């Protein structure tokens, strides 16, 4: 066989490119896609929020080389860090959190796990989508059976909706012409009942099902006495009414004074059939966390059903079920052919990168559950220093990228009330509310028994479809004091029925949608505010308001927000004129409410007493921000995050008055601009503001700001300005009278050991300086700044250091660590504040601390730095468990990855008998594994050769025995596209001339074109042969798997080489065309068992591809430039290159 290529410029790609490209796609795209699931987690009861900045993830390069990992029996992996923002009630922090260790692929295309090289095989699985199939009865000889024939000899038609992750759904028409829905571990469901549950009315269902025989509802009746559809539907309605009566009776039977009434109500609602059905439908098909079609599956469904649903909507819709049923009935009526499930277009390849991505997704789901459990069940006082008392048993919510909330509380109603269909017709969404409505409920305290009674009444009303929102019912009942007597409740109930919203159906062209249009009379505004008299200075309270999402006149605020902002600024500048001329921008009703309730009054804060020095700094910083606000001073030259925080703060702080009483300086009050969404501002919020302003003042004292480069990214977000000032501690040499501050700060991403040691000669600021040790050394140069004190640790004395003593180190600069001096002359800081900053530094640089402790200990012994207290450093190391470190552990992701490499059958020890065995092992494709085929039950159809395998899967190389046909190898030119489908190259043929450019076609596209084999002879100008007669000018070709002869001018594509149809191992067999197929199969397998020679020799008979296999296996040294080898020894190899310029 001649292995020549028609275009010599088309070279064979890297034989390990399948593995390398897949892992590269994981690092660039797949990892970010999985980390975006960690958007943020919030617990509103405990006022805790975790925000994951998934797009800014970082890797630390492995500390060891692959060779060292094998020798030391370690895993060649890289640490994955992600910035996480932690927000509590009174504290905020941004931390680099270690999520886990991702095993890295070597240049040779394999992994090293515990010192052992391992390979993750590619897996061939069924492509997600919709597939139609027919199972004929063996007794039925003729397939031409009418659809009206009700005999048992008719075939069974069914279609499978296969997702990438989730439950398989089968639509089936049995021999009795009944349509069913089938799922695993669930009894079959009638199609009509399933469509009604999805929100379709009988008119749509009758329009869908052409024949009346498809409307059989005999599943509710006795099969021996079938009835028509009308009687069956009547029985359905009767049973539903009976269930409604039984539920009302169960509610009436409950004792109103029973303290456990809430549990009983939840149990009754949980065991109700419609509620369970909502849970089942949502979790099975409409929840993105448990069901995923993938963009490929959505594309296949849209193509077969002629839909236009966006590709990013990867869950099922009611339209998919409706039109899939319609297409199934059409195929059953016309007796259409079923889909070919062995076609390569219905199979896709899961490469190692995708398998790793799936395991990472499972690990992230476990991590979310772990975080939520810790937030709900752990005492978080040790996480947040100033946190208030927390309650146990609260619920948390996960906010995904599409802003869909999945509440993790077991008794939550969210899963039932958020079906994307008409099935949740009791739920009212906020966007359907009428304009100008809002509800603000009174916050009256009731005893437990009264609350249970109100809850029972509200549930009765909800079930009777009288009201929509349970919170509104309770608020309405509380405001009316309905528990006093029964007559008042009856009057209220009659009044409420008259005011309740009626159901108004709005149908579109298809008649599939409906919604509720409520009346605005049922919503009331009853704020209960403890207003503060601005003139009395005895008591300072906060304005507290319960504003729901519907908010304070939402439509009014949207239209008049700018005018309100202008008016508020006028009020803030002149506090005495609160609501003068408000009628010009507000309606009369809103004006009256504002005058009575004072919605938009200023907040008055009573902060705690603070030290005089810090308050002076606070006052200076506020004055500076005021200058920036009124354009009296230019904005500071900080990075984007700092500018954002300054602009955010200057819009709220307008005035800060300072007063001294009893030798104590306190902040009397601060005017703060109100917000419309959340008006109340906690008192402890002031401490965060204080810390921000103190830190900002350090940079403002000199009138200039530090010009931080883009390299300082995540550590300086929002509040981390203090990281610029002090990230570590000063180390002074007791023997050196002129101390040189040395930075021991290193990069999070290490470069090499020599560079780390080179940075040890730079120093930084240390808190709690031992003044008795440093007094003699610092007296000469800092006598005017430091006072003598015998106390080794003076907490009250602020440490003052000159600007030449302070340097900044940047850990995120691409060029490495560099120093930058502060511009300001001096700065003030208390020892306690510097200690906090030291702890923040150690939290984010745990790896650095572990590496540098040994170096510092050696320096102490050599340079006699005896004043360093190792006990204190160890305490800092033990205190590294920050709020995020306690909530987020690496066990979830590391455990999921260990399952892939340790338990998954697709992860195998790398075959290292010879270079060919290694290359073949890395390119292998297996149909077995999780989600694949079981070799004990695999039929011959799965194992056999399909026409679409040409140029994509080798028909020769496959194992012998049970795995025959289930484990294959791709051909030498095949590649995997972005969607996981195999492609093979072809040359375009234009009017009988072969073009130079190659086109990669998948199996579905190739089936549409006229393709010729690659062994046709052609002229020097790449023209196909043209004979004198018509017969001689015809060439063989195939289209749609049919072979025939056709004129050369009608050919559209041609193969590139005879080598295109076989794999790498098969291409090394000489004279393959003269070999028997069975012997060629055994020969391709036995080549991988050959033991390599100690002294390499060229083969006596070869095909010319042996050198390429050796080169891509990385067993030999390769030069980057071509040339002539002039010298070889056991120490060096000299290659002489030739350049045209020389």
Curated annotation (Swiss-Prot):
Its EC number is 2.7.7.6. It comes from the Eukaryota. It catalyses: RNA(n) + a ribonucleoside 5'-triphosphate = RNA(n+1) + diphosphate. InterPro entries: DNA-dir_RNA_pol_su2 (IPR015712), RNA_pol_Rpb2_2 (IPR007642), RNA_pol_Rpb2_2_sf (IPR037034), RNA_pol_Rpb2_3 (IPR007645). It is found in: Plastid, Chloroplast. It is an enzyme of class 2 (transferase). GO terms for biological process: DNA-templated transcription. Keywords: Chloroplast, DNA-directed RNA polymerase, Nucleotidyltransferase, Plastid, Transcription, Transferase. Disulfide bonds: none annotated. Its main location: plastid. Pfam families: RNA_pol_Rpb2_2 (PF04561), RNA_pol_Rpb2_3 (PF04565). GO terms for molecular function: DNA binding; DNA-directed RNA polymerase activity; ribonucleoside binding. One of its GO terms (cellular component) is chloroplast. The keyword Ribonucleoprotein does not apply. The keyword Nucleotidyltransferase applies. In L.terrestris the gene for this protein is split in two. In plastids the minimal PEP RNA polymerase catalytic core is composed of four subunits: alpha, beta, beta', and beta''. When a (nuclear-encoded) sigma factor is associated with the core the holoenzyme is formed, which can initiate transcription. DNA-dependent RNA polymerase catalyzes the transcription of DNA into RNA using the four ribonucleoside triphosphates as substrates. Belongs to the RNA polymerase beta chain family. This is DNA-directed RNA polymerase subunit beta N-terminal section. It comes from Pleurastrum terricola (Filamentous green alga).
